[in-house]
């Protein structure tokens, strides 16, 4: 029997982001159909099968971008028409408990107009699996350094 991985979603007027939380995923299989059907399946770290199918709110393009990280897989799916969806799924019922809003990627309509990165897909894929920054937690305080050298 297969299990459902946690799925986080966010949108822009022209695309939908789906983040599948599945560490060390193998044998990833994805299918995007123009009428809005998105299907995913993969094997987890212990070989267990994870899968889900979503009937998305609107029509989508069959091409998608995928970024496989250590802990998750991020999909950027192009909408057929530029518009803001009122929800992720076509069904008006409450979504399954494994589907949640990705507040880290979420952008409201008015924020997108003001944002220069609204069409920049790269921003969704940057530092998703990074555990540390380049500065190794060090903070540079030039005023303290000046005081110490006096």
Swiss-Prot record:
Localisation: Cytoplasm; Nucleus
Superkingdom of the source species: Eukaryota
Annotated tissue distribution: Widely expressed but preferentially in the root meristem.
Key words, A-Z: Chaperone, Cytoplasm, Nucleus
Keyword Nucleus belongs to the record: yes
Modification comment: Phosphorylated by casein kinase 2 in vitro.
GO molecular function terms noted in the UniProt entry: Hsp90 protein binding; protein-folding chaperone binding
Acidic residues: bias regions: 112-123
Binding partners and assembly: Interacts with HSP90 in an ATP-dependent manner.
Protein name: Co-chaperone protein p23-2
